[in-house]
Protein backbone atom coordinates (compact mmCIF):
# COMPACT_ATOMS: atom_id res chain seq x y z
CA UNK A 1 0.00 0.00 0.00
CA UNK A 2 1.02 3.66 -0.25
CA UNK A 3 2.59 5.50 2.66
CA UNK A 4 0.05 6.19 5.43
CA UNK A 5 -1.34 9.67 5.83
CA UNK A 6 -0.76 11.84 8.87
CA UNK A 7 -4.26 10.98 10.10
CA UNK A 8 -3.61 7.27 9.68
CA UNK A 9 -0.34 7.56 11.58
CA UNK A 10 -2.15 9.42 14.35
CA UNK A 11 -4.74 6.63 14.46
CA UNK A 12 -2.01 3.98 14.65
CA UNK A 13 -0.19 5.94 17.32
CA UNK A 14 -3.37 6.18 19.37
CA UNK A 15 -3.97 2.44 19.01
CA UNK A 16 -0.40 1.70 20.09
CA UNK A 17 -0.74 4.07 23.05
CA UNK A 18 -3.84 2.20 24.19
CA UNK A 19 -2.23 -1.17 23.48
CA UNK A 20 0.77 -0.27 25.62
CA UNK A 21 -1.49 0.70 28.50
CA UNK A 22 -3.59 -2.46 28.16
CA UNK A 23 -0.46 -4.61 28.15
CA UNK A 24 0.74 -2.94 31.34
CA UNK A 25 -2.59 -3.51 33.11
CA UNK A 26 -4.08 -6.75 31.80
CA UNK A 27 -2.24 -7.95 28.69
CA UNK A 28 -3.66 -8.47 25.21
CA UNK A 29 -2.67 -5.10 23.76
CA UNK A 30 -1.89 -6.61 20.36
CA UNK A 31 -5.61 -7.26 19.98
CA UNK A 32 -5.81 -3.47 19.57
CA UNK A 33 -2.64 -2.60 17.65
CA UNK A 34 -2.76 -5.48 15.13
CA UNK A 35 -6.30 -4.79 13.86
CA UNK A 36 -5.49 -1.06 13.72
CA UNK A 37 -2.86 -1.88 11.10
CA UNK A 38 -5.39 -4.01 9.23
CA UNK A 39 -7.87 -1.14 9.36
CA UNK A 40 -5.57 1.28 7.53
CA UNK A 41 -5.03 -1.23 4.74
CA UNK A 42 -1.98 -3.34 5.54
CA UNK A 43 -2.15 -7.02 4.53
CA UNK A 44 -2.31 -9.40 7.47
CA UNK A 45 1.30 -10.61 7.31
CA UNK A 46 2.66 -7.07 6.94
CA UNK A 47 0.44 -5.92 9.81
CA UNK A 48 1.66 -8.78 11.99
CA UNK A 49 5.39 -8.25 11.38
CA UNK A 50 5.02 -4.48 11.82
CA UNK A 51 3.23 -5.07 15.10
CA UNK A 52 6.01 -7.44 16.23
CA UNK A 53 8.63 -4.74 15.64
CA UNK A 54 6.53 -2.04 17.32
CA UNK A 55 6.21 -4.13 20.50
CA UNK A 56 9.94 -4.28 21.27
CA UNK A 57 10.32 -0.92 23.08
CA UNK A 58 7.28 -1.65 25.22
CA UNK A 59 8.71 -4.99 26.35
CA UNK A 60 12.06 -3.30 27.06
CA UNK A 61 10.38 -0.65 29.18
CA UNK A 62 8.42 -3.24 31.11
CA UNK A 63 11.52 -5.30 31.79
CA UNK A 64 13.39 -2.23 33.03
CA UNK A 65 10.51 -1.37 35.36
CA UNK A 66 10.74 -4.86 36.90
CA UNK A 67 14.52 -4.88 37.39
CA UNK A 68 14.22 -5.17 41.17
CA UNK A 69 12.03 -8.28 40.85
CA UNK A 70 14.57 -9.79 38.44
CA UNK A 71 17.32 -9.73 41.05
CA UNK A 72 18.45 -13.29 41.78
CA UNK A 73 16.80 -14.65 38.61
CA UNK A 74 19.79 -14.27 36.30
CA UNK A 75 20.17 -18.02 35.90
CA UNK A 76 16.52 -18.45 34.96
CA UNK A 77 16.67 -15.55 32.51
CA UNK A 78 19.74 -16.96 30.78
CA UNK A 79 18.48 -20.56 30.58
CA UNK A 80 14.87 -19.81 29.65
CA UNK A 81 15.97 -16.88 27.49
CA UNK A 82 17.99 -19.25 25.31
CA UNK A 83 14.96 -21.54 25.00
CA UNK A 84 12.78 -18.54 24.16
CA UNK A 85 15.20 -17.34 21.49
CA UNK A 86 15.18 -20.72 19.73
CA UNK A 87 11.38 -20.91 19.90
CA UNK A 88 10.97 -17.35 18.63
CA UNK A 89 13.29 -18.04 15.71
CA UNK A 90 11.28 -21.13 14.81
CA UNK A 91 7.97 -19.28 15.04
CA UNK A 92 9.20 -16.34 12.99
CA UNK A 93 10.65 -18.65 10.34
CA UNK A 94 7.25 -20.31 10.11
CA UNK A 95 5.59 -16.90 9.76
CA UNK A 96 7.93 -15.76 6.99
CA UNK A 97 7.22 -18.95 5.07
CA UNK A 98 3.44 -18.67 5.43
CA UNK A 99 1.47 -17.20 2.55
CA UNK A 100 -0.90 -14.31 3.21
CA UNK A 101 -3.86 -16.54 2.34
CA UNK A 102 -2.79 -19.20 4.84
CA UNK A 103 -2.12 -16.60 7.52
CA UNK A 104 -5.53 -15.01 6.90
CA UNK A 105 -7.10 -18.43 7.46
CA UNK A 106 -5.49 -18.99 10.86
CA UNK A 107 -5.64 -15.44 12.26
CA UNK A 108 -9.24 -15.67 13.58
CA UNK A 109 -8.33 -18.82 15.51
CA UNK A 110 -5.17 -17.20 16.89
CA UNK A 111 -7.15 -14.15 18.02
CA UNK A 112 -9.67 -16.43 19.77
CA UNK A 113 -6.80 -18.31 21.43
CA UNK A 114 -5.37 -15.03 22.71
CA UNK A 115 -8.82 -14.06 24.02
CA UNK A 116 -9.21 -17.41 25.78
CA UNK A 117 -5.80 -17.06 27.41
CA UNK A 118 -6.63 -13.56 28.57
CA UNK A 119 -9.99 -14.68 29.95
CA UNK A 120 -8.75 -17.66 31.96
CA UNK A 121 -5.29 -16.44 32.99
CA UNK A 122 -6.19 -15.50 36.59
CA UNK A 123 -8.03 -18.81 37.12
CA UNK A 124 -5.26 -20.79 35.46
CA UNK A 125 -2.58 -19.13 37.55
CA UNK A 126 -4.41 -19.88 40.81
CA UNK A 127 -5.35 -23.44 39.84
CA UNK A 128 -1.99 -24.78 38.68
CA UNK A 129 0.60 -22.50 40.25
CA UNK A 130 3.72 -24.53 40.97
CA UNK A 131 2.11 -27.89 40.15
CA UNK A 132 3.50 -28.69 36.72
CA UNK A 133 6.62 -30.93 36.70
CA UNK A 134 9.78 -28.83 36.53
CA UNK A 135 11.10 -30.71 33.49
CA UNK A 136 8.20 -29.43 31.39
CA UNK A 137 9.15 -25.77 31.87
CA UNK A 138 11.56 -25.48 28.95
CA UNK A 139 9.21 -27.35 26.61
CA UNK A 140 6.29 -25.11 27.51
CA UNK A 141 8.37 -21.93 27.22
CA UNK A 142 9.61 -23.12 23.82
CA UNK A 143 6.05 -23.64 22.57
CA UNK A 144 5.00 -20.26 23.94
CA UNK A 145 7.93 -18.61 22.17
CA UNK A 146 7.05 -20.34 18.89
CA UNK A 147 3.54 -18.90 19.21
CA UNK A 148 4.97 -15.47 20.06
CA UNK A 149 7.34 -15.50 17.12
CA UNK A 150 4.50 -16.45 14.78
CA UNK A 151 1.73 -14.14 15.99
CA UNK A 152 2.52 -12.34 19.25
CA UNK A 153 -0.92 -11.46 20.63
CA UNK A 154 -1.31 -13.12 24.02
CA UNK A 155 2.38 -14.04 24.33
CA UNK A 156 2.76 -12.52 27.79
CA UNK A 157 -0.42 -14.18 29.02
CA UNK A 158 0.74 -17.56 27.74
CA UNK A 159 4.22 -17.24 29.26
CA UNK A 160 2.88 -16.11 32.63
CA UNK A 161 0.53 -19.10 32.78
CA UNK A 162 3.41 -21.44 31.86
CA UNK A 163 5.75 -19.97 34.47
CA UNK A 164 3.07 -20.02 37.16
CA UNK A 165 2.36 -23.67 36.36
CA UNK A 166 5.97 -24.75 36.79
CA UNK A 167 7.42 -22.39 39.41
CA UNK A 168 6.22 -21.83 42.97
CA UNK A 169 7.22 -18.18 43.04
CA UNK A 170 5.84 -14.75 43.91
CA UNK A 171 3.61 -13.48 41.09
CA UNK A 172 5.51 -10.20 40.77
CA UNK A 173 8.77 -12.10 40.26
CA UNK A 174 7.07 -14.36 37.73
CA UNK A 175 5.71 -11.31 35.94
CA UNK A 176 9.23 -9.86 35.81
CA UNK A 177 10.58 -13.11 34.37
CA UNK A 178 7.72 -13.21 31.88
CA UNK A 179 8.61 -9.69 30.75
CA UNK A 180 12.26 -10.58 30.24
CA UNK A 181 11.39 -13.67 28.18
CA UNK A 182 8.84 -11.69 26.17
CA UNK A 183 11.57 -9.16 25.39
CA UNK A 184 13.83 -11.96 24.11
CA UNK A 185 11.05 -13.27 21.86
CA UNK A 186 10.24 -9.76 20.62
CA UNK A 187 13.88 -8.90 19.82
CA UNK A 188 14.55 -12.17 17.98
CA UNK A 189 11.32 -11.82 16.00
CA UNK A 190 11.93 -8.14 15.23
CA UNK A 191 15.44 -8.80 13.93
CA UNK A 192 14.22 -11.64 11.72
CA UNK A 193 11.24 -9.82 10.26
CA UNK A 194 13.29 -6.63 9.96
CA UNK A 195 15.76 -8.46 7.74
CA UNK A 196 13.37 -10.66 5.80
CA UNK A 197 9.77 -9.50 6.35
CA UNK A 198 7.54 -6.77 4.87
CA UNK A 199 7.81 -4.36 7.82
CA UNK A 200 6.15 -0.96 7.40
CA UNK A 201 8.88 1.04 9.11
CA UNK A 202 7.23 4.45 9.46
CA UNK A 203 4.13 3.09 11.26
CA UNK A 204 6.37 0.78 13.30
CA UNK A 205 8.43 3.73 14.54
CA UNK A 206 5.36 5.80 15.41
CA UNK A 207 3.70 2.90 17.19
CA UNK A 208 6.87 1.93 19.06
CA UNK A 209 7.17 5.37 20.60
CA UNK A 210 3.49 5.52 21.46
CA UNK A 211 3.51 2.06 23.03
CA UNK A 212 6.26 3.10 25.45
CA UNK A 213 4.24 6.13 26.56
CA UNK A 214 1.14 3.96 26.96
CA UNK A 215 3.06 1.34 28.89
CA UNK A 216 4.42 3.89 31.35
CA UNK A 217 1.00 5.47 31.81
CA UNK A 218 -0.62 2.05 32.22
CA UNK A 219 1.92 0.95 34.79
CA UNK A 220 1.35 4.11 36.83
CA UNK A 221 -2.42 3.72 36.87
CA UNK A 222 -2.66 -0.09 37.02
CA UNK A 223 -3.43 -0.13 40.75
CA UNK A 224 -6.37 2.28 40.37
CA UNK A 225 -8.11 0.75 37.35
CA UNK A 226 -10.44 -2.28 37.44
CA UNK A 227 -8.15 -4.73 35.67
CA UNK A 228 -10.87 -7.40 35.58
CA UNK A 229 -13.31 -5.15 33.75
CA UNK A 230 -10.60 -4.12 31.30
CA UNK A 231 -9.66 -7.77 30.75
CA UNK A 232 -13.23 -8.73 29.85
CA UNK A 233 -13.62 -5.67 27.66
CA UNK A 234 -10.58 -6.70 25.64
CA UNK A 235 -11.85 -10.29 25.47
CA UNK A 236 -15.24 -9.17 24.13
CA UNK A 237 -13.55 -6.90 21.61
CA UNK A 238 -11.27 -9.74 20.51
CA UNK A 239 -14.15 -12.16 19.97
CA UNK A 240 -15.93 -9.62 17.77
CA UNK A 241 -12.67 -9.01 15.91
CA UNK A 242 -12.19 -12.75 15.31
CA UNK A 243 -15.69 -13.02 13.84
CA UNK A 244 -15.09 -10.00 11.58
CA UNK A 245 -11.76 -11.42 10.39
CA UNK A 246 -13.34 -14.82 9.72
CA UNK A 247 -16.06 -13.22 7.59
CA UNK A 248 -13.72 -10.99 5.56
Q: What kind of region is each of these model predictions?
A:
Residues 57-62, 112-119, 162-167, 212-218:
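Alpha-helical transmembrane segments and their membrane-interface exit regions
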Residues 17-21, 36, 63-64, 89-93, ...:
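Alpha-helical transmembrane segments of multipass membrane proteins
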Residues 1-9, 38-46, 93-104, 194-202, ...:
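Helix-coil boundary and interhelical linker segments in multi-pass alpha-helical membrane proteins
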Residues 61-71, 109-133, 240-248:
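Transmembrane helix exit motif
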Amino acid sequence: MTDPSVLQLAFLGGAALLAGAVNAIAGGGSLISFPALLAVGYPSVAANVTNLVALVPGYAGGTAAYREQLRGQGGRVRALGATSAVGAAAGTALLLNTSSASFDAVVPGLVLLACALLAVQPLLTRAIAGRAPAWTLHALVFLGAVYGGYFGAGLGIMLLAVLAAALAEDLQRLNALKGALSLVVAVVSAVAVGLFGPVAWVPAAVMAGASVVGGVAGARTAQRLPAGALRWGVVAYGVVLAVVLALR
